[in-house]
Regions:
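Active-site glycine/GP-rich loop and adjacent strand/helix microenvironment
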Residues: 1-124
């Protein structure tokens, strides 16, 4: 998501607070997915994303893409989606995240100078 340079960038907590206030709701749920994949990860209220059983996330080390980051350490997000049976089932994103628990991750942002990606042209 994000503003894609069209508005002032804001952190997720700030955006979620504005949405909760505007729509008079207690929590915001989120989806993490991309065009190249058939599956998505979902976050219910707390910003921790969980994947379905056929989709796996890997947090790679910043300095060594062949090494995994430790739990609660940030790194680049890789996704394996076994639902992609006739296309590439794994991608390396330029998103930064951390594995919080064995089956959940948090998105922290994007790598500096990474290409602007996504279809979300969020506006208020």
């Amino acid at each position: 998501g994000g503003m894609k340079g069209r508005r002032k960038e804001m952190v997720r907590q700030e955006l979620h607070q504005q949405l909760k206030t505007a729509f008079n709701v207690d929590a915001i749920h989120s989806e993490y997915g991309m065009t190249e994949l058939l599956s998505q990860a979902y976050s219910k209220k707390n910003g921790l994303f969980k994947t379905p059983p056929w989709m796996k996330f890997i947090i790679r080390d910043f300095e060594d893409p062949y090494s995994l980051a430790k739990i609660n350490s940030s790194g680049g997000i890789n996704i394996i989606d076994l639902a992609n049976i006739y296309s590439c089932s794994f991608i390396e994103t330029q998103d930064i995240g951390k594995e919080v628990e064995k089956d959940s991750f948090e998105i922290l942002g994007r790598f500096d100078k990474s290409e602007v990606r996504g279809c979300n042209l969020l506006s208020f």
